Design a protein with these regions (language model features):
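Alpha-helical solenoid repeat scaffolds
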Residues: 1-169
């Protein structure tokens, strides 16, 4: 993280800066980095990846910064992240997350084909969206939803993800 982030800070606008920033964010998955260094980098260069956004949210919260909740909700809704970070973020945000936040996360997880995280997320989705999410998860996992006894919701035919998965898109 330090190598990439230091280079980006020293040479802002360097060609392919976005790739360097993404590599810095990916390094957070492998390295322990001081919270103040994480927040200093992301304060100047907002996260480009959802795992980076999630790490930023946790660092903000640990430092008691007011924007932690807003960044955390955006990360929650944004899709996949490291399992340990997911658990920490959920513990931090559970009191403020709304059904729409959980449904948005599930949609992002399904689009990213993050099956294991999507299966965990099923516990939190709204009852009205659950069947549609189960159908989409089945399609991602290569299972026929009808064989599992799941009805195909009429509004699902208009959703681009399931239509594409069925080969009709």
């Amino acid at each position: 993280f330090d190598d990439y982030s230091s280079f980006v800070v020293t040479y802002p606008g360097f060609p392919e800066e976005a790739k360097l920033r993404i590599r810095a964010e990916q390094a957070l998955e492998r390295e322990g980095v001081e919270l103040t260094r994480i927040t200093a980098f992301f304060d100047r260069f907002p996260p480009l990846t959802n795992p980076g956004r999630a790490r930023y949210a946790l660092a903000l919260a640990a430092l008691g910064r007011s924007e932690a909740r807003e960044v955390g909700r955006a990360a929650w809704r944004g899709g996949p992240m490291n399992d340990a970070v997911e658990a920490s973020l959920l513990a931090q945000l559970a009191p403020v997350l709304q059904p729409s936040d959980h449904d948005a996360r599930m949609d992002a997880l399904l689009w990213a084909s993050a099956g294991a995280q999507a299966e965990r997320q099923l516990l939190y989705v709204s009852p009205g969206a659950r069947t549609g999410f189960l159908v989409r998860l089945g399609l991602i996992n290569g299972r026929d939803p009808a064989a599992a006894g799941l009805p195909q919701p009429t509004d699902l035919r208009a959703a681009p993800g399931p239509v594409e998965a069925l080969g009709a898109g």
